[in-house]
Amino acid sequence: MDKLNLSHAGFKAYDIRGIVPDEVNEELAYRVGRAYADLYYPKTMCIGYDVRPSSQKICEAASRGLTDGGADVYNIGRCGTEMMYFGTFFYKMDGGFMIAASHNPSNYNGIKIVRQEGIPVSEDTGLKAVSYTHLTLPTT
């Protein structure tokens, strides 16, 4: 796994985004997944990823973090962000992760997190807690 300079650098108001691999990489994805699971105890999580070259590996790492934290992860594969929202809502999952970086160039990637019913997680509703918790986890 890529090593990470542990910080809050990639954490934005509504998601996590940054340059791959300097700010967003497999290590960060694992730690975010594990931190989310440790904080919110989800039983089921939906996860998907976009077409960026780094997305599948980042998705797999986030899935491992969620699984190691006790969640059952349903990987819906390559998809649009709306499909992760739909899967989380329709299948009554406890939350969802989407590996994507919106309009940013292909050397960027990120993680968008939603709670039950596809409700976005933002800085004020849990992302800040994930940001601090990921720093307390042991390095892998």
Predicted features and spans:
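An N-terminal, well-structured beta->alpha segment
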Residues: 1-64, 68-69
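Ferredoxin-reductase
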Residues: 41-117
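Glycine-rich phosphate-binding loop plus the immediately following alpha-helix
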Residues: 120-132
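Conserved small/polar residues in nucleotide/adenosyl-binding loops
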Residues: 133-139
